Amino acid sequence: ILRKTNALLEGHFILSSGLHSDQYVQCAMLLSHPKEAKIICSSLSKKIRKNFKNIDIILSPAMGGIVVGYEIGRQLGVKTIFAERVNGKLTLRRGFNIPSHSNVLIIEDVITTGKSILECAGIIKINNANLVGYACIIDRSNNKTVLKNKIISQIKFKIATFKANKLPKYLRKIPVKTPGSRNLSK
């Protein structure tokens, strides 16, 4: 389905995390196809129902998690909100709030390092709510994240990542693209 929707890209990419990769999953391409998005999200919704109980709110980081979070929320009948970056920090805006003691599930399109979902977990904590876990379409974390809660994913996808100073020769020869939505300034 990733190839069919042109969501699996090959080349030289700088990920939102700052790491480099020779493959990139552009979930926006997958989600731009309603039929395929519904199929993927329906399957993920079933896994979520099986693994997480009593979800009051779905919280997604902008940009990538918004569509996935909304569709999962629609299918589960759960309120869905999102956090967006203000001055480089994920924040609740637009009147969104998380009531104290709410059970919150974080949903993202792709998890690699876990940075965005950990920021969302921080928002849940400062609102004195409960983090029930994480869900995503693509889990690229290779079990390297520092997450303490369970990740439910539709696809576990192992893609090699490299630090800028440890690029393989073949990758250094390919022009760089920066497709992610998080702007990291160094």
PLM regions and their residue ranges:
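Short amphipathic alpha-helix with an adjacent loop that forms part of the alpha/beta core around
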Residues: K50, G95-P99, N165
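PRPP-dependent phosphoribosyltransferase catalytic core
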Residues: I1, A121-K186
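Short, glycine/charge-rich flexible loops or terminal/linker lids adjacent to PRPP-binding catalytic cores
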Residues: M63, V68-L105, T113-K115
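Hydrophobic/aromatic beta-strand patches that form the interior of the parallel beta-sheet core
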Residues: L59, I81, L105, V132-A135, ...
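Active-site-facing substrate-recognition patch
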Residues: I1-F52, N183-K186
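Short glycine-rich phosphate-binding loop at a beta-alpha junction
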Residues: K53-A62
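Short, well-ordered alpha-helices that flank and scaffold nucleotide-derived cofactor binding pockets
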Residues: K46, K50, Y70, R74, ...
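A contiguous pocket-lining binding segment that forms or flanks enzyme active sites
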Residues: G95-A135
